[in-house]
Amino acid sequence: MFTGINHTRKEDFSVVWDLGRRCTYACSYCGPHHSNKTSPLVEIDKLKHTLDGIVKYSQLMDLYRKEPLKLDIAYTGGEPTIHPAFFEFVRYAKETYPFIRSNITTNGCYSEKKCREIMDCVSSTTLSYHTEGTPEQKKLVVANIKLMHESGYNFRINHMFHKDYFDECIELAEWFDELGITYTSRPIGDSNNKSDLLDGTAHEYTPKQLEYFKNQWTQKSKPKPKAPSGVMHMLTTEKPKAKTSLETIGRPCCNGKCLSVKVDDEWTKSFLV
């Protein structure tokens, strides 16, 4: 079933479609509410019928608009590609409704053939990289990242930084930087939630690891200065101020994002979402 429809934007009609909880991974920090091996799978006919209904609904809304809506569908899970009918379904979506812009959130752990099918049928990909995978799994994911990059496909990476594999995560981030691949360094869970720390769905990072996050986000949030004519590179020696927790340094993640919320007619900063 789909989990959300966003029709607040002026020109876009966006659907977040949860295709099920099942996943090919079993990450220690991912609770059963995010992934499992037993949740039921929706039949292909029901998937197609639901998609047909979404398109009809958006077209009905277009009758009362000067300009038609742009229909976006984001497939998520679990791992969407574990659904046995997934590739048949996205092929149907592309061939029947070529105007739909689609995205998939995936772990990238599948064959080259499936990766090429995704590139052909899905407009863009958000790939979550997890270092808890086996060496064989991670080798497969890296190969697919390289394939998407070399193919000029539209994708980005959510790089999940595991506290116990931090050096490996840094090495991979440096590889992304070398290739010019877009990625976000993401802490795992909410380190300010004690129950999440106890059950392992959140990681507590060392000061050195937090410093790495701070430097990453500071660099990514600031526009790069333009070099004067004839200058190839510009270097800066400015050091950002030290901070010691995810809350104080800010966190670009869906589960702990710094937001401004209005409370009693006052705007205040909220850490927990």
Positions of the model-derived regions?
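Radical SAM enzyme core and accessory elements
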Residues: M1-R9, D264-T268, V273
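Canonical Radical SAM [4Fe-4S] cluster-binding loop centered on the CxxxCxxC motif
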Residues: F2-H49
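Residue-level signal for mature regions of secreted extracellular proteins and peptides
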Residues: V16, G20-C23, I73, L246-E247, ...
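Short cysteine clusters
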Residues: C23, C27-C30, C253-C254, C258, ...
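Radical SAM/AdoMet-radical enzyme domain recognition
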Residues: L51-K56, L60-A74, H83-F176, T182-Y183
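Active-site beta-strand/loop signature of hydrolases that rely on acidic residues for catalysis
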Residues: G77-G78
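Radical SAM enzyme [4Fe-4S]-AdoMet core and its adjacent flexible, acidic
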Residues: S124, S128-D264
